[in-house]
Structure formats: structure tokens, C-alpha cells
């Protein structure tokens, strides 16, 4: 049977006349360009009917892309793009009743006008779009660039036949070149439709150039990735091959593999290490993983480090305690002067250990100012016990992992400082000092003080769990010793775990003895000096301690002594003559001018000025309280950087005086006309605490009655609104400070009488102590009863003018009564 003749059509002018209308076939997954040929498969019944009718006629259909790009079973006129392609069906095949295969060739771009019918398929009138094929220099440049880039794309892409590259060179029409390239490159249906709808040929060439360059970049990047993958695979294959060869060579030589050698070493350590059962299981389990790892694996090092920690910790290694009490006492006395209370407690611990070796060790916390020997006392404990000594500083530690360690999931994870230091000590019963425990911080990383609760609890620390080890370690044999400067910043729960032993500041006499017996010999040795080169007179040592340092301990005093020793050493090195004996007048040459001048009791000479006693972290101090009054109605003014507690004490003192004004012969109207100002000198230093209550009240009464405070008298104590004198702390430091300032008498709250036992006998014998229960007792002692005690009998006061704002009732006021 003869094949039917296929009509011939041209884009510009036709051999066969084009019809006025054409059936529409939506094409959702592609775009047909003029002069291009594409295959299409039809499965929908309505389009099968369309094909049957077209094949019996002119074989023309319009392929138009839907606007949304979505597949539908039924498209309306509004769903289609306005521009499509008029196509000729070249071939049709029907392999079965459900499918039709078509081969379509594009003829020209068309624009749909109006739709003639919509059922059973769409049919519309159309207009053929003709193109201006004229070429200028820019067009020729664009065509040349497209041709060159397309050639490179054909060379790289296996999806584009080489024949198309050759064809692109022969195409002379710019629009046809753009259409051919756009139809063959890998771009989306939307991008191709955009090219089809671009009627300006020059603009179409530019868009195709952009798509072409983009496609070329993608292919080049893919090529590069593929090359890298191939290179990596080749490298792995090469490494695998070489390792196989290395393994064969080692087997021939009778050698074991590197990983197997390390695994065997770890196995030996585990078996001989006498690990606890939990640690033994963890180590064995990790060793099985380790033995299966390749040495070049990143996990190999992580696993090896973990096994190192498990096998090198002193699980069962401990030092034997030296429980010779006499020898321990001798060591403590040799290393430290004084400190009787801590020494006594340490010797008690040794005695208990001697009688009951299984007793749980205490958690001692040495509390005191800097330089009082807290840290060195820990070393002496280790010497006395014959144990290893380790120390970590907790100052500024804010991360819980510093105590417990990091979990092994983190890169570079390690155990916490507790486990690290114990491994370094090589024993499971060292003396472990937690220095500056009062300075532990907390932030978003956790609270280290909470982690220390387990460490310092004898009921829990036998199974301390470090996050890195993930097994329990027994800390119950460790003797923990902590140090702190202040106790207020230690959390209550942590404070409850420890036995706090206070280390008070030294007296001047104690400092002189310590300097002569310990500090000067040590600095001579460190600076290479002999006793003949340098010695200090008693007065020179006193001068250094009192005028060049201001501290409870001796750290700065040792620095000053070291400065003098270095100065002498420099002279000797230069060949200069040195006198050897350092006197007070020689100190200026080495240390410069005096840095501190101590307050003395001679300063409190005017009404309204009273000498109080204060406690500081570096020891006691005398503190002057100054009171004055001026006309006004603002009430009470407080200056000198006073804290809330001191402000409340001042308010309570003023309220007490106002309530008892009659008792002390003070004009009640005076408080309505005058303001009061209480100032505590050294305004740059913050001050707080209840100890100045009696001092402030005495200063106000002294001011209002015009009476001076007794010369050489200081006081301390808290007051109530009822006038009761309450006990305060820091009595030892305060009394020592008073003695240093030349004060002979001190007023103390009666409940503090017991605290005199802590004061050195030499200081106590040089001073007179008064104990007060009520403010009346204080005022009687301080003002000698000169108008400041409660009246027993009313007597009219003399009326006389004064330049001071007298608060006594005037005769005129009395006459009105």
C-alpha cells in the first residue's frame, strides 16, 4: 500500500497553503521550536481523536505550552500561552489502542487569535509570526560566540550528539541558530518557552548565550567533581593495594601489624593493671573496638587516648601514711609559726587515722586573709602524712567540665581537673588542695560548685563519675583541703560539706618572729647571700611590716625583704661595700618612701569624732566616725561609701537619740531645725557591716552634748532601737589593730568577752577592756559622764550663746515649762 504524501510547508511562504484554523495540542513537558523535530506520545482519548482527524487532512497541529506548566486532562483557552509552534506530523505509529507515537517537525511560531471550538479538542484561528533575519555586527558576534560555546558544550556533554555541533556551524539564520541551540541544551520548559516567546532575534540570542554559559559551567563543575571522586577512589585503591602488600611483607617477616601491637600492649596493661570491675569491663569493651580500627582512622586516636587514661590511673596505688604524731608536730612547727588551731586539728586527724585506719577523712577548709599560710599549710600536711601533694586553683573557674570533664563525643575531650591531677600524682590518696574555693563562678556552661558537692561528700565520692571516663573512681581515700579568703561567697550546700578552720591575721610581734625565723633566711638563700652580707635589726623589721605593708599575712612583707636583699646583692655584684646590718634609716634607699601611715588614737580630740574598730579581709583597722550638724530640714546624710547595713545602723542611732533626747538633756526641737551628717573617712573604700552602730551613736551624742570622747578609747558593737549592745565578729583582728594604733582601752559587747581567749597574751595585758550591755554603759565610759549620761535630776542649764549649734535645752525653754 502506498504511503500518503506529506504536505510541504515553509515558515515564510508555503508550498501548500496553510489553513485558517488549526487544532491545539497542549505540550506540558517540552517546547517545539521551528525547524526542530521532536517525538511525542499521546495517551489521552480526545487527542487520539484529534490525531485521527488531522492525519486524514493536512497533518498540521499547534503545539502550545500551558501557562502554569501543570499537567491537566482538560485545558481551556485561558490555560495556554499565547505563542506556540505550528507543527507538521511527519510520522505516526500506534503500537496499541492506548498509545500513539508521533514525530513532529516545527514549521513556524504562531500566535493564537480566537478559539473556534473547545470540544472534543481545542481549535483556534492563528497568525504566523515572521522574523527579521537581517544581521549586523553585534548579531554576527553573538552567533559566533554561541557557535564556539556550543562546540565546547558538545565536546563535554555526552547527551548532545557531535552532529549537532557541526550543524550549528552551518546555520546562517540567527533566529534558527538560537532555536536549535535552545532546543538541545538542558534547560527547563519555562526557560525554553521564554526563548520561544522572545520575538526579537538579537534579544533571543543573548538569552540563549546566558543559558548556554550557565549549562557549560554546570557541566565543567560536574566534570571537576567527577575527576576528584575518581582521583580519591584511585588513591584509596592504591592505599588498599599497598597495605595489602605491607601486610604480606610483615607476614613473611613474622612481624605483627602496628595496630595489633598497640592492642596487645593495651591488653597487657588491662590484665596487669588490677582495674575495678566496672573499669575493666569498659576498658575491655573499648579494646575490642580499638583492635578493629584502622590506624589511619580518626577514631583510632580517640580510642587510644581513652585506653591510655583507663590504664594509667592509680586505681589501686596508694602511699602509706606516716602516723608518727611527734614527727608530724615537728614538721608543722618547723614550717609554720603559730596557727595553733589548724595544727591541732591536723594532729587530731592523724591520731584518729592511727586508731581507725578506715575512718573517712575530713574536708578541711582554711579560711583567712591572703598571706596567712593557707596553701603552704596544705603542703605541710602532705609532708607530715608522707603523701603526694596536688593543688588546683578554682579562682575564676566557671565551667562544670573543669571538674567533671567533657563527654567523649566532643572533639578533644579530656577528663576533669580532679582526675587529671590524681593521675599526675600517681596515687589514689594524695593531699588534694582546692585553692580559692570561694572564687568559683557560674554561667551558662554550668555551676562548678555543684559538681564539687559530689567531690567533697564522703558519702558520695567513693563513686565519683567523670564524664570522660564514664566509670566511677574512688575519691574517698583522698584528703581534700580547701582554702578561702571569705566564706560568704561559698554556696551554703558546699560550705556544709567542709569543716571551716579560721586562720586569723598575725600580730606585729608574730610577724616580726616569722620574718626573722622564716622569711629572711629564705630570701638570703634565694638571692645568694650569706648572713655576713645582710641582717635586719628588730626595728628595721618592724618598720618594714608597719610602714611598707598593710596586710593580715606576710606575703607583701616577704616581697619587701626580697627587694632589700636584691639591692644588697646588686651592690655586692658591682664590688661595692655593704654594711651588712639593715637599720630603719637604710630602708629608704632600697624601698623608697614610707607607703602607709597608721591612724592613732591621738586624732579623736573633738566632739562628734569617735574611733571605731573594723574588720577587713587583710586584718583589723581603726575607723574614725565623724558627725556634724548644720541648719536645715533634710534629716540625716551619710557619706564615705557606706553599705546598706551601716546606713541602717546610722538611722537606728539617730532614732534612739531622738527617742531619748530628754534623758541626755538634748533639746527635742533641735532635730527639726538641724540636719546631721555622718562621714567615715577614706571615702574611696566601700564599707559595710553592723559593727559601727555603737560608734555612730556615740559620735552623735558627743556632737549634741559638746563632749569629747575619752582619749585612747575605741569601740565596736551593734545596737538595737532599745539601746541594747549586740555582739559582732572579728574581735581578735580589731583588738590587734587597736593595739597597733596605740589604743589603751576598748569597749566591746559583753557577749564578745569569750573572744578575748583568742587574743595574744602580750596584747591583752597591754590593754584594758570594758564590756557593755546597753548604750548607757558605752556613753558613761566614753564621755566620762559629762552630760551624756541619763539625768537623775532636772536642773536648769545656763543660757549662753555658742558658735556651735548647741543641742542642750536653753534656759528660756525651761522657763516656759
From Swiss-Prot:
Ranges of residues in domain Lon N-terminal: 22-216
Subcellular location field: Cytoplasm
Gene3D superfamilies tied to this protein: 1.10.8.60, 1.20.5.5270, 1.20.58.1480, 3.30.230.10, LON domain-like, P-loop containing nucleotide triphosphate hydrolases
One protein family per Pfam: AAA
InterPro entries xref list: AAA+_ATPase, ATPase_AAA_core, Lon_bac, Lon_bac/euk-typ, Lon_lid, Lon_proteolytic, Lon_Prtase, Lon_prtase_N
Domain Lon proteolytic: start-end pairs: 604-785
Keywords: ATP-binding, Cytoplasm, Hydrolase, Nucleotide-binding, Protease, Serine protease, Stress response
Disordered, as annotated region: 784-817
Enzyme class: hydrolase
Signal peptide range: none
EC number annotated for this UniProt entry: 3.4.21.53
Taxonomic superkingdom: Bacteria
Biased composition (Basic residues): 789-817
Similarity annotation: Belongs to the peptidase S16 family.
The protein, known as: Lon protease
Amino acid at each position: 500500500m502506498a504511503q500518503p504524501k506529506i504536505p510541504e510547508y515553509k515558515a515564510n511562504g508555503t508550498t501548500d497553503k496553510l489553513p485558517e484554523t488549526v487544532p491545539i495540542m497542549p505540550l506540558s513537558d517540552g517546547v517545539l521550536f521551528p525547524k526542530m523535530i521532536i517525538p511525542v506520545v499521546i495517551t489521552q482519548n480526545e487527542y487520539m481523536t484529534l490525531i485521527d482527524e488531522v492525519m486524514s487532512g493536512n497533518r498540521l497541529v499547534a503545539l502550545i505550552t500551558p501557562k502554569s506548566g501543570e499537567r491537566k486532562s482538560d485545558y481551556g483557552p485561558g490555560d495556554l500561552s499565547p505563542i506556540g509552534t505550528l507543527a507538521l506530523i511527519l510520522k505516526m505509529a500506534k503500537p496499541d489502542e492506548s498509545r500513539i507515537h508521533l514525530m513532529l517537525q516545527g514549521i513556524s511560531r504562531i500566535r493564537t487569535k480566537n478559539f473556534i471550538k473547545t470540544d472534543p479538542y481545542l481549535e483556534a484561528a492563528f497568525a504566523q509570526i515572521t522574523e527579521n533575519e537581517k544581521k549586523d555586527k553585534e548579531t554576527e558576534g553573538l552567533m559566533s560566540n554561541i557557535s564556539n560555546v556550543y562546540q565546547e558544550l558538545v565536546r563535554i556533554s555526552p547527551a548532545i550528539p557531535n552532529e549537532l555541533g557541526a550543524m550549528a556551524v552551518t546555520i546562517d539564520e540567527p533566529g534558527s541558530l538560537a532555536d536549535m541551540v535552545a532546543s538541545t541544551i538542558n534547560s527547563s520548559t519555562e526557560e525554553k518557552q521564554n526563548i520561544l516567546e522572545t520575538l526579537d532575534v538579537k534579544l533571543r540570542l543573548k538569552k540563549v548565550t546566558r543559558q548556554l554559559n550557565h549549562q557549560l559551567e554546570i557541566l565543567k563543575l560536574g566534570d571537576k567533581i567527577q575527576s576528584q571522586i575518581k582521583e580519591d577512589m584511585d588513591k584509596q585503591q592504591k592505599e588498599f593495594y599497598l597495605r595489602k602488600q605491607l601486610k604480606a611483607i610483615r607476614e613473611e617477616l613474622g612481624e605483627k601489624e602496628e595496630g595489633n601491637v598497640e592492642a596487645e600492649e593495651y591488653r597487657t596493661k588491662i590484665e596487669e593493671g588490677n582495674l575495678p570491675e566496672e573499669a575493666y569491663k569498659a576498658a575491655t569493651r573499648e579494646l575490642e573496638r580499638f583492635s578493629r580500627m584502622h590506624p589511619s582512622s580518626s577514631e583510632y586516636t580517640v580510642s587510644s587516648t581513652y585506653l591510655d587514661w583507663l590504664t594509667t590511673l592509680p586505681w589501686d596505688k596508694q602511699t602509706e601514711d606516716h602516723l608518727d604524731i611527734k614527727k608530724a608536730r615537728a614538721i608543722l612547727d618547723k614550717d609554720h609559726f603559730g596557727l595553733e588551731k589548724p595544727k591541732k586539728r591536723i594532729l587530731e586527724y592523724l591520731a584518729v587515722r592511727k586508731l581507725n585506719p578506715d575512718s573517712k577523712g575530713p574536708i578541711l577548709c582554711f579560711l583567712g586573709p591572703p598571706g596567712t599560710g593557707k596553701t603552704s599549710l596544705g603542703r605541710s600536711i602532705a609532708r607530715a602524712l608522707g603523701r603526694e601533694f596536688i593543688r588546683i586553683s578554682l579562682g575564676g573557674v566557671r565551667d562544670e567540665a573543669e571538674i567533671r570533664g567533657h563527654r567523649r563525643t566532643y572533639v578533644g575531650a579530656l577528663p576533669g581537673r580532679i582526675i587529671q591531677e590524681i593521675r599526675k600524682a600517681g596515687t589514689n590518696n594524695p593531699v588534694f588542695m582546692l585553692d580559692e574555693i570561694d572564687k568559683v563562678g557560674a554561667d551558662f556552661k554550668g555551676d562548678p560548685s555543684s559538681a564539687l558537692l559530689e567531690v567533697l561528700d564522703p558519702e558520695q565520692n567513693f563513686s565519683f563519675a567523670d564524664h570522660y571516663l564514664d566509670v566511677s573512681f574512688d575519691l574517698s581515700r583522698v584528703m581534700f583541703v580547701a582554702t578561702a579568703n571569705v566564706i560568704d561567697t561559698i554556696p551554703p550546700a558546699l560550705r556544709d560539706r567542709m569543716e571551716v578552720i579560721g586562720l586569723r591575721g598575725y600580730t606585729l610581734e608574730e610577724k616580726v618572729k616569722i620574718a626573722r625565723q622564716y622569711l629572711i633566711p629564705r630570701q638570703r638563700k634565694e638571692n645568694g647571700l650569706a648572713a655576713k652580707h645582710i641582717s635586719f635589726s628588730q626595728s628595721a623589721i618592724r618598720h618594714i611590716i608597719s610602714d611598707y605593708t598593710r596586710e593580715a599575712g606576710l606575703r607583701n612583707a616577704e616581697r619587701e625583704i626580697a627587694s632589700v636583699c636584691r639591692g644588697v646583692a646588686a651592690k655586692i655584684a658591682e664590688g661595692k661595700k655593704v654594711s651588712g646590718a639593715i637599720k630603719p634609716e637604710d630602708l629608704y634607699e632600697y624601698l623608697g618612701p614610707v607607703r602607709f601611715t597608721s591612724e592613732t588614737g591621738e586624732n579623736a580630740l573633738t566632739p562628734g569624732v569617735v574611733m571605731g574598730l573594723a574588720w577587713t579581709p587583710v586584718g583589723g583597722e581603726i575607723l574614725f566616725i565623724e558627725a556634724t550638724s548644720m541648719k536645715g530640714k533634710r534629716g540625716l546624710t551619710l557619706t564615705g561609701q557606706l553599705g546598706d547595713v551601716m546606713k541602717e545602723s546610722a538611722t537606728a542611732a539617730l532614732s534612739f537619740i531622738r527617742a531619748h533626747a530628754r534623758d541626755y538633756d538634748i533639746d527635742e526641737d533641735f532635730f527639726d531645725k538641724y540636719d546631721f551628717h555622718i562621714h567615715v573617712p577614706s571615702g574611696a573604700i566601700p564599707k559595710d557591716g553592723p559593727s559601727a552602730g555603737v560608734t555612730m551613736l556615740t559620735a552623735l551624742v558627743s556632737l549634741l552634748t559638746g563632749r569629747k570622747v575619752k582619749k585612747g578609747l575605741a569601740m565596736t558593737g551593734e545596737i538595737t532601737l532599745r539601746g541594747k549592745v549586740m555582739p559582732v565578729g572579728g574581735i581578735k583582728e580589731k583588738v590587734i589593730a587597736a593595739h597597733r594604733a596605740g589604743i589603751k582601752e576598748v569597749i566591746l559587747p559583753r557577749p564578745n568577752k569569750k573572744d578575748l581567749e583568742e587574743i595574744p597574751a602580750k596584747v591583752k595585758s597591754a590593754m584594758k577592756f570594758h564590756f557593755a550591755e546597753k548604750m548607757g554603759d558605752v556613753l558613761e565610759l566614753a564621755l566620762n559622764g559629762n552630760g551624756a549620761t541619763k539625768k537623775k535630776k532636772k536642773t536648769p542649764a545656763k543660757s549662753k550663746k555658742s558658735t556651735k549649734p548647741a543641742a542642750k535645752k536653753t534656759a528660756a525653754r525651761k522657763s516656759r515649762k
